[in-house]
């Protein structure tokens, strides 16, 4: 009988104040921090079978395919065994590597993107997304 091995890591991914928030199709920015935003990763291994469970404080896990592919390549776990979940939080930033471009699912879904600060928003969101995605890998590597 194989032994079940379990690993768990939780990392803080609280964004900087002023970043644009996602949800309700309104332009809102982070003005304060009530609770930290987090990424949690649980790794399960039993014999040859490995599974990763990724939970992230985000409205939607738009980057789920990228996360699954990246973790699969790094750890040799089939993408079908990597489960990505968003907590559907309406007080967190957008997680979108392509924000501001036609490839962005967020841009396609939002009618309220045009603001005087859009260029700054794009830069902040893309930058935060890179940090966020790196922390997903860090948590899985823990």
Q: What residue spans do the PLM features occupy?
A:
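Conserved beta-alpha junction segments in alpha/beta enzyme cores
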Residues: 1-142
């Amino acid at each position: 009988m194989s032994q079940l091995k379990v690993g768990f890591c939780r990392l803080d991914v609280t964004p900087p104040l002023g970043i644009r928030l996602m949800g309700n199709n309104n332009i809102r920015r982070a003005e304060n921090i009530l609770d930290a935003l987090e990424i949690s990763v649980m790794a399960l291994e039993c014999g040859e079978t490995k599974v990763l469970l990724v939970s992230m404080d985000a409205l939607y896990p738009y980057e789920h395919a990228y996360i699954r592919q990246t973790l699969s390549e790094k750890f040799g776990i089939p993408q079908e065994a990597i489960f990505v979940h968003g907590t559907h939080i309406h007080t967190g930033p957008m997680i979108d590597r392509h924000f501001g471009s036609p490839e962005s699912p967020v841009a396609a879904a939002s009618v309220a993107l045009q603001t005087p600060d859009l260029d700054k928003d794009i830069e902040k969101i893309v930058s935060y997304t890179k940090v966020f995605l790196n922390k997903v890998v860090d948590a899985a590597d823990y």
